[in-house]
Amino acid sequence: MSATPEEDKKPDQGAHINLKVKGQDGNEVFFRIKRSTQLKKLMNAYCDRQSVDFNSIAFLFDGRRLRAEQTPDELEMEDGDEIDAMLHQTGGGAKNGLKLFCF
């Protein structure tokens, strides 16, 4: 007798997922959220814990910027996945009025 698909699931593949948010300084903060929860909840909690403004941080998963309304389910995140928290970089303009043209 073979197992049903529900029986094949690992116990940890339930409604919750454990995620790690890693800052540029190497500091790691761990979260456990529902797979259907919008990531803005995790993002806000991270910013509160780090005492930084929400708009000053970019959150990346697999090199792609996350949007606050996305969920772990949408992104097919797995238990233990890592999100990078990066400070926004501003500036980068040319010095002395020089302009760069690409053709």
UniProtKB/Swiss-Prot annotation:
Sorted UniProt keywords: Cytoplasm, Isopeptide bond, Nucleus, Ubl conjugation pathway
Domain Ubiquitin-like: start-end pairs: 15-92
Alphabetized Gene3D superfamilies for the sequence: Phosphatidylinositol 3-kinase Catalytic Subunit, Chain A, domain 1 (3.10.20.90)
Signal peptide positions (record): none
Keyword Nucleus tagged: yes
Localisation per UniProt entry: Nucleus; Cytoplasm
UniProt cross-link Glycyl lysine isopeptide (Gly-Lys) (interchain with K-? in acceptor proteins), position: 92
Family, similarity comment: Belongs to the ubiquitin family. SUMO subfamily.
Name used for this protein in its record: Small ubiquitin-related modifier 2
Organism: Arabidopsis thaliana
